[in-house]
Amino acid sequence: MMSKLDPPEAGRSALSRPRLIDRLASAAHGQITLVTAPAGAGKTTLLRSWLAAGQVPGVPVWVSLDAADRDPGTFWSYVLAGLDRVGLAVPSGEIEPAGTPVHLLAAALYGRAEPVLLVLDDADLLAGSEVPEELDFLARHAGSALRLVLASRGDPQVHRLRHRLDGSVTDIRADDLAATEAEAREIFALHGVTPSDECVRAVLRRTGGWMAGVTLTALAAAERLGAAGPGRGHDDRAVATAADADIADYLDAEVLAPLPPADVQLLSQVGLVEHVPGALAVELSGRPAARQALDDLGRRTSLLQRCRRHEDCHRMDPLLVRLLAGRRSAGSSRRLHRRAGEWCAAGDRSVDAAIHLATALDWPEAASALVNGYAVAHLSAGPQARRLLAVFSGMPPDSRGAQSAVVLAAVAVARGDAEVAAKQLGRAEELVDDVPPDRAGALALALAVAGAGLARLSGDADRAMEAR
C-alpha cells in the first residue's frame, strides 16, 4: 500500500525540465491542474521532478492509481492514508452512508492556512466511477485549502466547467510536454550520445517530441550505434530511426493493447494520415457517427485532438499513424488508400488524392489526379514537393497512359535526370491522342510544365525540345 503513496523512482533518463516545473508551480496556485497526454509523454516524471524541486504551494500528498481504485472506498482509504502520512489525519467521525469520507474530509480541510496538494497519477482510471464526482465535490467545498493535480491519459471527468469560469483550472497537454531541441539533446547526452543538430531535429520530427520516443531513440543509438553517435560514421537517419522497432513495441503495449477492439479498428480505418477530415473518417469507417466516436476516443486517450485551424478535422500523432500502417495487411491498406484517394479527388484535393492513390499503387489514377488537378508543378515546388517526390519516385517507368508519362517526366526533372525526363516527355506526346477531349487541356499544361522544367535543367530550350 505504501508504495502507492510515493512517486516512482527516477530512471536513468529522468530529465529536469525547468520550463514545465515553473509552469506547474504557477498552475498549482489554482484549484485544479490537469496534465493530460498519452502514455510515455513524461507526465509522471514531470510531477515527480516538480515535487523534488520543492516549488509546491502546500503539503503534497501523492497517490498512484490503478483499476481497483475506481471503488470509492478503496480510493479514499489511500487519500486518507496519504494525509495521515504527512501528519494531516482527518478526525474520526460518522462516515457518509455511501461509505466515503468525502464530506468529512472537505470539512476537515476547509479553512486550513496551508493547502493540501493532492497529486493523483493515472487519474484516467477513475473515469466512469463515482470518484470524479466526489473529487469535484471536495474541490468545491474544501475551497482554497485543496489543490488537485491530476495526471491522466484522457479526460479524468472531473467537472471542470464551473471551475473554468473562475479561471481556477490549468491544462498542460501533450504539445506542452513535447521535448524541445535542448531537452532532446540533453536526453541523448544522458546516454553518452552527441548527435548533430540536424539529427536532433530529425528525431523530433519523427517522434513529434514524444518523450518516450526520444528516450528510446537515444538509448538505441547508444546501444546499437555506439556512444559516439553520428560522428563515428553513423548518419543522422541511422540515429533517428534506431529505435523504430522499440517504439512500435511500446506503442503496441502501452497505447493500443489497453483499448477495446472497436477503438483499435476505428483508428486503423481512419489513421492513414496525421490530419483526418470528419467526412473522410465517415467514408473510411462506414460509421455515420465517426466524428463523435473520434471525439470520445480523444477525450479518453489523448491520442488525437481536433485540428486547430479546421474544426471538422482530427489530428493523430505521426508515430501512431506509422504504427497503424505497419499493422494493416497490404490488401486492407490499398483499399483504404484507394477510397481516401477517390474521396479527396471528388473534393478537389488533388495532391492528397494523388498521394493516397500512389500509396495504393494505383499509378494511372494517381497520375490522373495530379494532371487533372493541375498539380504537376507541385512535384518540384511547394510545401508538398518532398512528400510527393518520395511517393512518386516508386512509380514504374512503364506506367500506362500519357498522364503517367508526363508525371514520370516531371519526377525526373525534380530529380535532375534530363535523359529520363526527355524520354518520358516523348512517350507522353505519342499518347496524347488517347486522352479524352475534356482532359486534353490539363494534359497540355502538364506537358508545358514538365517541358519548361527540362529546358531549365538542360540549360538549352532548343536542345530540350529536340530531345523530346
Q: What is the meaning of each model-derived region?
A:
Residues M1-A39, T45, S49-W50:
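Walker A/P-loop-proximal flanking segment of P-loop NTPase domains
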Residues S3-P7, S16-L20, T45-R48, S77, ...:
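Alpha-helical sensor/transducer elements of the RecA-like P-loop NTPase core
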Residues L34-A41, L47-L51, R153-G154, E198-V200, ...:
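C-terminal boundary/linker of central alpha/beta nucleotide-binding cores
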Residues A39-A41, T45-P115, L125-A127:
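Conserved phosphate-binding/catalytic loops and adjacent sensor/switch elements of nucleotide-binding enzymes
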Residues D121-D122:
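Walker B catalytic acidic pair
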Residues D136, I187-L190, R201-R206, A212-G226, ...:
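C-terminal helical "lid" of AAA+/P-loop NTPase domains
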Residues G326-V411, R415, V420:
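Extended alpha-helical scaffolding segments used for macromolecular assembly and cargo binding
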Residues F392-R468:
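Internal alpha-solenoid helical repeat scaffolds
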